């Protein structure tokens, strides 16, 4: 009985598998921006999951050359050769053959699916939906970053405009005061009180309507 070959196609190969991928790869742009800014997630849940993943020991299959090497080492040492786990040509009992006595064998059917093709189609559909969700999240994050940068620029422009206005008003006050002092000195009756001078209120400020007397 020949082993059936499974041909896995690309996610975007089928037209009817789901919605088409967006023309702009926002996820790739987000990854490039993350690497450029050297951003790393430090959420406790992600760190715990990463620690568990690194501590987990994955069962790797034993290479076929190891039993032969153990036999040669046993012969060189003068000891009895170590027998392999199974004889040559003897196949390990599969789970399907072991469970034949318990329940009847259902050929060509998987749990929850009628065939392997149906399972592959479902898996392809799930992967397509996950890719679209990743693209949407990446697009939202990129848009949010753009909005934040726009707000920062607007705030900086407002501060710069306010600074320019203050400098302009200060120059105008100096020019007006210089003209007044050159003509005739201000009388003490027209000068403002000391508390107003301490907080920066002058006659020129009042004339320019920058402060309210109410």
Swiss-Prot record:
Keywords: Coiled coil. It comes from the Eukaryota. InterPro entries: FAM167 (IPR024280), FAM167_domain (IPR051771). Residues 118-156 form a coiled coil. Expressed in skin, including primary keratinocytes, spleen, kidney, leukocytes, testis, lung, small intestine and prostate. PANTHER family: PROTEIN FAM167A. Belongs to the FAM167 (SEC) family. This is Protein FAM167A. It comes from Homo sapiens (Human).
């Amino acid at each position: 009985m020949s082993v059936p070959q499974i041909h896995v196609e690309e996610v975007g190969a089928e037209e009817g598998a789901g919605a088409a991928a967006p023309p702009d790869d926002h996820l790739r742009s987000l990854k490039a921006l993350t690497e450029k800014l050297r951003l790393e997630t430090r959420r406790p849940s992600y760190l715990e999951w990463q620690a568990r993943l690194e501590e987990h020991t994955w069962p790797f299959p034993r290479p076929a050359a190891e039993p032969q090497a153990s036999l040669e080492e046993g012969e060189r040492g003068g000891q009895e050769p170590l027998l392999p786990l199974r004889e040559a040509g003897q196949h390990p009992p599969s789970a399907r053959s072991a469970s034949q006595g318990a329940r009847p064998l259902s050929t060509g059917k998987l749990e929850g699916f009628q065939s392997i093709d149906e399972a592959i189609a479902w898996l392809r559909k799930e992967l397509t939906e996950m890719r679209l969700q990743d693209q949407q999240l990446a697009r939202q994050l990129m848009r949010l970053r753009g909005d934040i940068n726009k707000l920062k620029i607007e705030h900086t422009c407002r501060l710069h405009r306010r600074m320019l206005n203050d400098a302009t008003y200060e120059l105008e006050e100096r020019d007006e005061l210089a003209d007044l002092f050159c003509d005739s000195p201000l009388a003490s009756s027209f000068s403002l009180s000391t508390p107003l001078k301490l907080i920066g209120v002058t006659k020129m400020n009042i004339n320019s309507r920058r402060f309210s007397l109410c």
